[in-house]
Amino acid sequence: MAKERALTLEALRVMDAIDRRGSFAAAADELGRVPSALSYTMQKLEEELDVVLFDRSGHRTKFTNVGRMLLERGRVLLEAADKLTTDAEALARGWETHLTIVTEALVPTPAFFPLIDKLAAKANTQLAIITEVLAGAWERLEQGRADIVIAPDMHFRSSSEINSRKLYTLMNVYVAAPDHPIHQEPEPLSEVTRVKYRGIAVADTARERPVLTVQLLDKQPRLTVSTIEDKRQALLAGLGVATMPYPMVEKDIAEGRLRVVSPESTSEIDIIMAWRRDSMGEAKSWCLREIPKLFNGK
């Protein structure tokens, strides 16, 4: 018990100051104490731990190997203690320590980068921006693993506590490589025609919810990939057909790397922001005000 009492945050702060300032006198000046008080604290620590922390053979204060080890590991504790204090103070003011924004794969993560420095200027809230696919985004919100979700409006809500707001409308186009045989089929394309060609899809990331598929027919052969960029690359490689967000393939279409299969297959979907009303903090409220500004004019 004596050893536990001796190794206090105060003692570790004294050791840290001595190392950074190079002497007991300079450390005492930084800490607003007299050198004899620091000497007493260190001597008491040495006695109770039964170790030698300082090499006192020279003119300059030097740590022994044991002292250096205790200092370096102690700094980890000091950093953790400081962070704990900061987080507690922030939480007391109503600012969350962590906030998770989940974007569905159709929503580009870089669109949210302007939030990061703005939020950091207001609080020490740690921000996570995570991508999920289809039902995986909504599952995170339902299970409390997301504070805010930005995703296509799937027209389902699992709780009256979930609120939402439309951000913008996204146009989707049905595309394939320019030499894909589907372009030789007569329009409008029937399901009998479409089912002959491999569809490319991004895997739903839901763990417990029933997984969803969009724009794929039951008996259609398919290639499933992990990301929307993998889906685009598979299209460019001529491996199949798929619906893609127009902004993600606009340049590919303009430069002839992809071609719209059927203009009649073009569709629009609302992208919404959703959140739980039963868990509101300052950081979340701030983000709910700021996120719509990122999409003004879309």
From Swiss-Prot:
Belongs to the LysR transcriptional regulatory family. Keywords: Activator, DNA-binding, Transcription, Transcription regulation. Residues 7-64 form the HTH lysR-type domain. InterPro entries: LysR_subst-bd, Tscrpt_reg_HTH_LysR, WH-like_DNA-bd_sf, WH_DNA-bd_sf. PROSITE patterns: HTH_LYSR. It comes from Escherichia coli (strain K12). PANTHER family: HTH-TYPE TRANSCRIPTIONAL REGULATOR, HTH-TYPE TRANSCRIPTIONAL REGULATOR YHAJ-RELATED. This is Probable HTH-type transcriptional regulator YhaJ. Gene3D superfamilies: 3.40.190.290, Winged helix-like DNA-binding domain superfamily/Winged helix DNA-binding domain. Residues 24-43 bind DNA. Positive regulator, may be partially responsible for expression of neighboring gene dlsT (yhaO). One of its GO terms (biological process) is positive regulation of DNA-templated transcription initiation. It holds the Pfam family LysR_substrate. It comes from the Bacteria. One of its GO terms (molecular function) is DNA-binding transcription activator activity.
